[in-house]
């Protein structure tokens, strides 16, 4: 019985085997006719899609480059058609826009207290323009030596050397780049002096001269050696002395500061950080320096620097102007723009506000980056950064 079942199963197995073999052969024969063309079609579709994407990317990249070129071209042109043409080949150029208003003009209200809170970087303090005592704010003055720590710490004579934060920030950047160039050992030897401290210095000088002079002659004699209280650059909170010092090597501070590589580097580069050398004289601190004591009223050689802001410092540097001369320049040219290597860098606008307790600062919508400062000569100087 089992033999009969087995004999009947054999043909079925053989049949199935033949069928499977036939299907395999059929698949083998069909593959080049159906499957391969499908694979080729899919591969071609993928290649076409990839090529289309690459083409779109190339087109988009070309459009992007064209747009950037157009924007750069527009950026290098005066934004106002009334502006005079500038020469993009020049390292720097200043255009006088005094008869042209600010473009896309707007305004924001400020008070004198607002500007005095953090130090007016363009506040002129000299023998003819004393510090406005009723407005001056000492609250934001900071200790130079305590303002930073670690590698950023600034060396100062002691913890009582004070400056406004914006001056400390600028000095920190300058010292960082000086260090990268191989120049170190700078020390802030003097900073802010209060009215009371300056008064003590002045009275001490008068006492010393009292054996030779009296009355008004005594006051005038003392003024030649020590600034009258409120008229010293040290009263601004933005002026500071520099010298070299290393407590482990007294020879570091032996040479005259201005003759050292460190002093020369600082005097040549400080303007890039918004800092100016305050009282230049003939061939001092640099061989190219011209005597400006007739403008500053200071003929004593002091290694004294003053923070005025990058835009103001750049223009003073290019035009070789002191603060006094720069403000006089802006009185005659109240709206100017500075181009560096063909690119608009700073725009400066001076408006008259007098002694008003509050005023509308005239602004342009062309940039959101700006700083404004009273100049102690009835003006408000606003610098727009581009």
Describe every region a protein language model picked out.
Residues 5, 11-191, 195-386:
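Extracytoplasmic cell-surface/polysaccharide-interacting catalytic and binding patches
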